Amino acid sequence: MEKKYFAPSELIINEDGSIFHLHLKPENLADKVILVGDPGRVALVASHFENKECEVANREFCAIIGTFKGKRITVLSTGIGCDNIDIVLNELDALANIDFKTRTENEQLRQLTLVRIGTCGGLQPYTPVGTYIASAKSIGFDGLLNFYAGRNQASDLEFEAEFKKQVEWDSQLGNPYVACADKELLDTIAADDMVRGVTIACGGFFGPQGRELRLPLQDPKLNEKIENFSYNGMQVTNFEMESSALAGLATLMGHKSVTVCMVIANRLAKEANASYKNTIDGLIEKVLERI
């Protein structure tokens, strides 16, 4: 069987041999990858490394490759949103599993371990500001996974149907999907000191998360319905903006992934911590030790 050829219009490679957006080369990619949204957080993670091989930056995508306690790690910023995760996951997978010289799939496929460290808004009384939440399931309001074949195989369809039923989901909002973290990686990273939750990845920070400034909301009671949702003992614990695309695409590509977030605002208690950057290092240290 002839190998599939990836044309220059589909797989864009820069003149220096790096991939189009991330500006990383295949040799820059470790099997263990830590993803952060904020480019400034890359240096914070890498400050724990014993040594650094190289640093790369393009737009919001900043990367440092180094070693922590003998583990080679690539830490990379994604920017905000599932659209950026689509770029990051596809380009990381290409770096891992496509021969850039022949533009064909490698004979031996690599499985990456991907851990996203982020921030989120808590939705339950037991997720106050400062809580660490590991996303066992992620409900994607973004619709990204719906563009890929295998979407249903990578989704928890029963959970999805029950969610849409309980919150009286309006089809005009698009079709949500429910993607799961890798169970083994979830157990390793969450251990016994993180809340294992159900996360909603929203397509925006304001309206999609129920924040109302000058523009009114299409469904002002949606957040209340989300907070009251319960299925098989699981509730929606938090809002963020990337976890569903990460979990869904990683599953389809054969990689392991999990998202862990620190709660910086609790929507029920109307509390927020704007100076969270001083305290997220504790979560970073846990992930570095456990990845």
Which positions does each model-derived feature cover?
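Metabolite-binding pocket within alpha/beta catalytic cores that recognizes anionic/polar moieties
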Residues: 2-177
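Active-site rim beta-loop-alpha module in soluble metabolic enzymes
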Residues: 158-231
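Zn-dependent metallopeptidase/amidohydrolase metal-coordination segment
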Residues: 244-275
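His/Asp/Glu-rich mid-to-C-terminal helical/loop segments that flank catalytic regions of hydrolases
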Residues: 266-291
